[in-house]
């Protein structure tokens, strides 16, 4: 199947529309909210478009830290404001039903918002066999490594978890596990061994397209 991986949107309606026009399963890695230069209604339209596509089984959606910022105070981050809060609140039922903490396309292919770094993989003895069960167990509890916020991003942990890991300062790839994620802005899709950071829509209008 062809997959279109779409990086952090932050209110860019035109990028959502461009992605949805492509053939293949679209996977959005989160962060639709909290642009500093886009109006609230652009963010609302972004959510409405991806929610509709998800209901039609044309797309899948992963939580970003900027969505969780409005749902879990632990994840509160820059850009938070009351207009965006209302946008999320009005769609909370759909968001909680459709958004995922992560997606394993295969046991060896993980898609998340910010990536799973090798430090967490090693520390908690994760394997390809136990990865999905462990992540499902971690998701409801904000004190688990999935929700860690690293020192580099202003948190109390040595590295960030799947919503906060910084590509430049904290991420190390895991042998045998291909990963796609966003969160750390840069120019173009960046690759480190078998991992890809796709948060590039501020600088380069690129999606990552793969046959899996």
Q: What positions do the PLM features span?
A:
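Active-site metal-binding loops of divalent metal-dependent hydrolases
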Residues: 7-9, 30-33, 65-67, 114-116, ...
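Binuclear metal-dependent phosphoesterase catalytic core
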Residues: 185-212
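Active-site-proximal loop/helix segment associated with metal-binding centers of metalloenzymes
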Residues: 82-87, 101, 106-172
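Short loop/helix-cap segments at secondary-structure boundaries that form the rim of catalytic
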Residues: 17-22, 173, 188-194
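Conserved beta-strand scaffold positions in the cores of enzyme catalytic domains, especially
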Residues: 3-5, 26, 61, 179, ...
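Core catalytic region of metal-dependent phosphoesterases/phosphodiesterases
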Residues: 6, 11-91
């Amino acid at each position: 199947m062809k997959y279109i991986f779409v990086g952090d949107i932050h209110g860019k309606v035109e990028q959502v529309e461009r992605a949805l026009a492509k053939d293949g399963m679209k996977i959005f890695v989160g962060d639709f909210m909290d642009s500093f230069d886009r109006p609230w209604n652009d963010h609302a339209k972004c959510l409405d478009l991806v929610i509709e596509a998800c209901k039609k089984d044309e797309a899948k959606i992963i939580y970003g830290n900027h969505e969780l910022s409005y749902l879990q105070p632990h994840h509160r981050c820059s850009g938070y404001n009351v207009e965006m809060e209302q946008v999320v609140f009005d769609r909370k039922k759909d968001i909680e039903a459709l958004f995922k903490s992560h997606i394993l396309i295969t046991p060896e292919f993980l898609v998340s918002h910010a990536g799973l770094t090798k430090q967490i993989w090693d520390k908690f003895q994760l394997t390809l066999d136990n990865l999905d069960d462990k992540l499902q167990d971690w998701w409801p509890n904000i004190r688990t490594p999935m929700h860690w916020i690293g020192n580099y991003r202003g948190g109390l942990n040595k590295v960030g978890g799947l919503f906060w890991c910084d590509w430049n300062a904290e991420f190390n790839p895991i042998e045998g596990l291909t990963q796609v994620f966003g969160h750390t802005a840069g120019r173009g899709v960046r690759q480190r061994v078998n991992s890809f950071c796709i948060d590039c829509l501020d600088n380069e209008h690129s999606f990552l397209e793969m046959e899996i």
